[in-house]
């Protein structure tokens, strides 16, 4: 429902590699949603045609709402400013692979998250994943007004990690 070439092509490729067929929607403008159908009802109909649904939507909480009406698994490909767990999994895999090249792991690393941390759904999901590791120091670098939401900071803090909030990058 939210356009993204990379998300659409990567999920399509993954489904094809798993031996499944891909059925794509053409966006919200030409869907029953544009005529007032609820996400729940749309999910009920789409799940009758699919083995699984990968969904990307511009509204927060939309993927969870869709999943309540769906009878098949729903994969969150991004829901508004909330989450993007599949991208976070890919980012985590990339971080692990790069650190493994140097025979290091994620535990005890110093990780900087930089940019729009308030609306950056990928960093929300990645921060939650990183909570499962040990002794990480997070530097959260964002301008005032775009700092990480408090519920993410609370999750990181409750996992026992150190947090440094910074409003700009400083050169040496």
Identify the meaning behind each predicted range.
Residues 1-13, 97-172:
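Glycine-rich phosphate/diphosphate-binding loop of Rossmann-like nucleotide-binding domains
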Residues 4-96:
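Phosphate/diphosphate ligand-binding glycine-rich loop within oxidoreductases
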């Amino acid at each position: 429902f939210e356009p993204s070439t990379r998300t659409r092509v990567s999920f399509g490729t993954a489904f094809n590699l798993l031996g499944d067929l891909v059925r794509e929607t053409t966006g919200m403008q030409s869907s029953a949603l544009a005529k007032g159908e609820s996400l729940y009802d749309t999910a009920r109909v789409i799940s009758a045609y699919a083995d699984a649904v990968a969904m990307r939507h511009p509204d927060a909480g939309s993927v969870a709402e869709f999943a309540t009406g769906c009878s098949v698994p729903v994969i969150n490909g991004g829901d508004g400013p909330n989450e993007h767990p599949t991208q976070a999994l890919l980012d985590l895999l990339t971080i692990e692979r790069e650190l493994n090249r140097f025979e290091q792991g994620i535990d005890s690393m110093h990780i900087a998250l930089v940019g729009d941390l308030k609306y950056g759904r990928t960093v929300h999901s990645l921060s939650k994943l990183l909570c499962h590791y040990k002794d990480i120091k997070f530097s959260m670098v964002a301008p005032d007004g775009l700092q990480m939401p408090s519920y993410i900071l609370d999750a990181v803090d409750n996992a026992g990690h150190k947090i440094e909030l910074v409003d700009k990058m400083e050169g040496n």
